[in-house]
C-alpha cells in the first residue's frame, strides 16, 4: 500500500502479533457473544494487545452475537460495555442484535434474517442518556 502512495494505513484485523503495528494493524476481538463473561474477556484482550505493543485495538461494544435490545439484563451489559469502550483506543458499536427481522426478499442477501437496530437510541431513553454522557466524555478527552 505504501508503494502505491498510501499513507496512514489502517487494517481492521481479527488477529495480530507483536510487530503487526508496523503494518497499520487495528485489531478487534472478532465476533464474540453478548455477555458479561465476554465483556470481562475484552479487558484481558486489550491488555494483551498493549503488551504486544499494538496500540490500536477494539471490541464490538455489546458483543456481536445475541443481545436482545428489549432485555433489561442485556441493556445493563451493553451500558457497561459502552462505558469500557469509551476508554478504548477505538470505540466501535457493532453487533447482530435480537429480535431478528424477517428476510427482505427471497434471493441473494435479501433471503437472510437481519438483526435489530443497534444505535444507542435503540435501547430506550435511559440507556441513550447514559451512552450520550460517555460519548461526550470521550469527545472531551479526544480534544485534550
Task: Annotate the PLM regions.
Residues 1-144:
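Catalytic-domain carbohydrate-binding cleft regions of carbohydrate-active enzymes
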Amino acid at each position: 500500500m505504501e508503494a502505491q502512495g498510501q499513507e496512514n494505513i489502517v487494517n481492521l484485523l481479527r488477529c495480530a502479533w507483536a510487530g503487526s503495528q508496523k503494518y497499520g494493524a487495528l485489531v478487534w476481538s472478532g465476533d464474540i457473544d453478548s455477555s458479561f463473561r465476554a465483556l470481562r474477556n475484552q479487558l484481558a484482550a486489550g491488555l494483551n494487545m498493549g503488551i504486544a505493543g499494538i496500540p490500536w485495538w477494539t471490541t464490538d461494544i455489546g458483543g456481536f452475537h445475541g443481545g436482545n435490545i428489549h432485555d433489561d439484563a442485556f441493556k445493563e451489559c451493553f451500558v457497561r460495555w459502552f462505558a469500557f469502550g469509551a476508554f478504548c483506543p477505538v470505540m466501535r458499536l457493532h453487533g447482530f442484535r435480537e429480535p431478528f427481522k424477517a428476510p427482505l426478499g427471497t434471493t441473494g442477501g435479501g433471503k437472510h434474517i437481519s438483526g435489530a437496530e443497534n444505535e444507542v437510541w435503540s435501547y430506550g431513553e435511559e440507556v441513550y442518556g447514559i451512552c450520550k454522557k460517555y460519548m461526550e466524555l470521550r469527545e472531551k478527552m479526544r480534544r485534550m
